[in-house]
Amino acid sequence: MSTRVVVGLSGGVDSAVAAYLLKQQGYDVLGVFMKNWDDDDNTEHCTARQDFLDVLAVADVLGIEVEAVNFAAEYKERVFSYFLAEYQAGRTPNPDVLCNAEIKFKAFLDDAIARGADYIATGHYVGKGHDTFGRAALLRARDANKDQSYFLYRLNQAQLSPALFPLARLPKPEVREIARRIGLPNAAKKDSTGICFIGERNFREFLERYLPRDPGDMTTPEGRVVGQHQGLMYYTLGQRQGLGIGGQKGGSDAPWFVAAKDMATNTLVVVQGHDHPLLQRFGVGAGQLSWIAGVAPDPERPYTAKTRYRQTDAACHITTLYDDTLELVFDAPQWAVTPGQSVVLYDGDVCLGGGIIC
């Protein structure tokens, strides 16, 4: 009997090509489409119906079976409730990180095992290897521009070990070329950019449906009122667009940036200039730690880390590491480090894990 791989098919080109490559390698491939959002499932806000039609069309070309599963209840309980609580607390969460750990590599993994899977696979741009102790290791993808290891840092050994990542060494243009060459109907489909499983939508309107809007003052660090915000949940550190602050009489023409949120007074603190000192930090603290190997990294060794997805790695060293507390100091100041986002550590091309920025 051939080895069975259950592939998470999203309707996009990456997971479709991943399924094709696995079939070419001789695996028994079953496609599974995950539907994880039920609210306002209409053509304006959600493309789930079209995505499923794309999955069916891909499965037809590849000659594989496909099934649909609904994890909407799990998504709301494990991901969306956290998402709302973080925004309500003034932080800026990254739902994709939790979505991967709780849905794509937990709910989906459990479902796949129940279907007799030996492995699961996704279209993520990451690699997998093993360390000197034989533990599964998460590696950067060959295509540095598409590498998604930042979003998978919360996986544990039980989740990573049965996972296959066929796109690990492929650049995105080559993935699209493969899709065109074999006649996949979604070869030119654009990449999704919305909130994990919720899709692309007006963010403020979406949040306002679940959290009450609470306008307040925008002030300088000295306390001078320069405008009004629409609700602290709508803003993130380092944000420049959408502040609605014009030039101040007798003041600088430098652009304004969000520097802090004062939850106690419902005040948004803004500063002028990209390089303002309040936007720079050498030290970063984190909690809710998760280490892929199951053990914490050696605090005596140097590492690199990133505090946001598109950021270039920066050299750092660990100053505090115990229980669920991590403190790092970077060699150079980091810009707009944002509570609620993740700081992720790397040892070369190996993603070690990380935590939620305090």
Swiss-Prot record:
Q: Where in the cell is it found?
A: Cytoplasm
Active-site residue list: C99, C196
Enumerate the residues binding ATP.
G8, L9, S10, G11, G12, V13, D14, S15, M34, G123
The catalytic activity of this protein is classed by the Enzyme Commission as 2.8.1.13
Keyword tRNA-binding in annotation: yes
Q: Please, which domain of life does this record's source organism belong to?
A: Bacteria
Where is the site Interaction with tRNA? H124, Q341
Give disulfide pairs as residue numbers.
C99-C196
Q: What's one GO BP annotation on this UniProt entry?
A: tRNA wobble position uridine thiolation
As its record notes, the protein acts as a catalyst of:
S-sulfanyl-L-cysteinyl-[protein] + uridine(34) in tRNA + AH2 + ATP = 2-thiouridine(34) in tRNA + L-cysteinyl-[protein] + A + AMP + diphosphate + H(+)
User: Pfam families under this entry?
Assistant: tRNA_Me_trans, tRNA_Me_trans_C, tRNA_Me_trans_M
Residues covered by region (Interaction with tRNA): 146-148, 308-309
Q: Which GO terms describe its molecular function?
A: ATP binding; tRNA binding; tRNA-uridine 2-sulfurtransferase activity
Keywords, A to Z, come to: ATP-binding, Cytoplasm, Disulfide bond, Nucleotide-binding, RNA-binding, Transferase, tRNA processing, tRNA-binding
Q: Which GO terms describe its cellular component?
A: cytoplasm
Please name the top-level EC class of this enzyme: transferase
Region annotation (Interaction with target base in tRNA) maps to 94-96
Q: Which NCBIfam families match?
A: PRK00143.1, trmU
The record's similarity note reads:
Belongs to the MnmA/TRMU family.
- Function of the molecule: Catalyzes the 2-thiolation of uridine at the wobble position (U34) of tRNA, leading to the formation of s(2)U34.
Q: Which PANTHER family match?
A: MITOCHONDRIAL TRNA-SPECIFIC 2-THIOURIDYLASE 1, TRNA 5-METHYLAMINOMETHYL-2-THIOURIDYLATE -METHYLTRANSFERASE
What is this protein called in UniProt? tRNA-specific 2-thiouridylase MnmA
- Name of the gene encoding the protein in the UniProt record: mnmA
